[in-house]
C-alpha cells in the first residue's frame, strides 16, 4: 500500500518527489528499478476478472481500443502479450526507455495520432484510467474521461482530477458501455 502513489505517474518523477532525489539519483533509482522489473516485476500483476470479455465485446461492436500508458511501451507490449490482451488493441503507446514521452498528455496525443482521430472527432473518444494523471492527460487532449476505482486511485482522486464519469467495478464499466 505504501507504493500505490508510484502507480500511474512517471517513475522518475515519483522517485524524485517521494525520496527527494536529484536528477542523477532519480535516474539511478529508475535504472535499478528497471533491472528487476524487466524480468521479474513485469509479470507481478494480473488481469481484472471480466476484462477479456469486455474487450472482446467492444471489439465485436467495432470500437477502436488503444492503450496509452506512462509505462515504457516495450514493457506494456510484453504484458499485453503475456495475458493474451494484445489482439484487442489497435494501438499501444507508452513512454520510451530514454525518457521521452513520459507525460500522460503526450502519450494520449500520440495514441490519438496513431488512431487517426481528428480534432473534430475527439468527442467520440473516451479515456479510461485509474489515476489522476490519466484524467489530466485526457483533459489536455479534450477527450472525455472515465475513472475506474477498481484500480489504484484514492477516494475522490478521479473526480478532483476532472473525471466525467466514474465506476467502481468492471461490471459497472460494462454497464456504462451498454448505455453509451
Label for each model-derived stretch:
Residues 39-67, 73-77:
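Short, acidic loop-to-helix structural element flanking the phosphoryl-transfer center
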Residues 104-135:
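Conserved Lys-Pro-Asp/Glu-containing loop-to-beta segment of HAD-superfamily phosphomonoesterases
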